Amino acid sequence: MKSHREMLRGIQREAGITQRWIGKESLDRRVMEAMKAVPRHEFVPDEQRPYAYDDAPLAIGCGQTISQPYIVALMTDLLDSTPDDIILEVGTGSGYQAAVLSRLVKKVYTIETIEELAQQAEARLERLGYSNVEVQTADGYFGWPEQAPFDGIMVTAAAPSIPKPLIDQLKPEARLVLPLGAGSPQELMVVTKKENDEIDIHRVLGVSFVPLTGKHEVP
């Protein structure tokens, strides 16, 4: 059973290995502090707790997973957030990614399609004191227009194409970080919305995520 400290070392090691693709050999200090502050074992089922600090995805029920810690840290880093930001997360899952983001920004709105997971995550986040996170059960493809525009959006499930509603809900020069692709593996992308509503797309590296589900699904 690995420790929290070993997980953090593993994240830095992975960053060094993938620096060719991510463009730097280490992740932002603030991101690493957030990863250090959030107890991953609180966000996994009891039977998975011995593996909570492995640098690997873990099943959380309902056919969903909690992402590999390195990928959580990398996507958080790529969002390039500031303390005053309001962020949207699509795909709450266990609430772990939202908890990490909450350490770095003013407010996190997070959407989960599966009601059971949303309720569990909401209760967990409240119990652990993450008061700046708000959870909604909805189809994340369509975002959260009532709270838009956002300073950044993160999608933690793979979409076959870039969801236009999410682009529409970004502020100018804000980023959308998401895995893109209908099959596996997918590509982790950073999509930046420009002042003229055009987008700049940057490929980071290959990843493997569960698919984004909801009414928008392509048969």
UniProtKB/Swiss-Prot annotation:
The positions making up the signal sequence are none
Active site annotation, chain numbering: 67
InterPro entries xrefs: PCMT (IPR000682), SAM-dependent_MTases_sf (IPR029063)
Record CDD domains? AdoMet_MTases (cd02440)
Q: What class of enzyme is it?
A: transferase
Reactions listed under catalytic activity: [protein]-L-isoaspartate + S-adenosyl-L-methionine = [protein]-L-isoaspartate alpha-methyl ester + S-adenosyl-L-homocysteine
Give the matching Pfam families: PCMT
Q: What is this protein's function per UniProt?
A: Catalyzes the methyl esterification of L-isoaspartyl residues in peptides and proteins that result from spontaneous decomposition of normal L-aspartyl and L-asparaginyl residues. It plays a role in the repair and/or degradation of damaged proteins.
Q: Which family does it belong to?
A: Belongs to the methyltransferase superfamily. L-isoaspartyl/D-aspartyl protein methyltransferase family.
Show the NCBIfam families listed in the entry: pimt, PRK00312.1
* The protein's name: Protein-L-isoaspartate O-methyltransferase 2
Name of the gene this protein is made from: pcm2
